[in-house]
Amino acid sequence: FKADINFDGESLQFSLPPDLTLIVSPHLNAKIKASELKVSGRIEVLEGKLSLDKLPQGSVSLSKDVIIVNDEGEQIVNDKPFDIFTNVRVVIADTFNVEGQGFIGRLGGELQVSQQANQPLQLFGSLKIPEGRYSAYSQNLSVTKGTISFNGIANNPYISIQATRSIEDENIIVGID
């Protein structure tokens, strides 16, 4: 079995309730042959909102030595019908809104999403935070600049955020970097 599929769209609404809504313009190609699926192309995220009231399921991954069994005690093997190879550029407009865990703001940037068969997903690129607010411990901070950079495995980004707050009756600005 072989297939070569192109998928192009403009301003498509995508949602993953209750946390994520997006408007995207995908330009993707999928090639299927034997036991391989290769996905490449570009996805433009025109608008979006991510709400993180609580950490999503899977935020804390299981140890590699965990074995999952069924009711009879037999190991459940997660067989995939295809070895998946991914090479997709994701361009996120800075109108993407994020809310949760004390943060409200926007982010945007470009990420290259790559994955080889049976390997972890990798991200390369950076997201900028053009504006935002962070509230914790009765303190309200304005995010004046921020960058989330990825250079490999997706769960290990480099985060650089500068947040400040003005003390109203004084000419003082305090913050964290």
Annotated model-derived regions:
Residues 1-177:
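Strand-loop-strand
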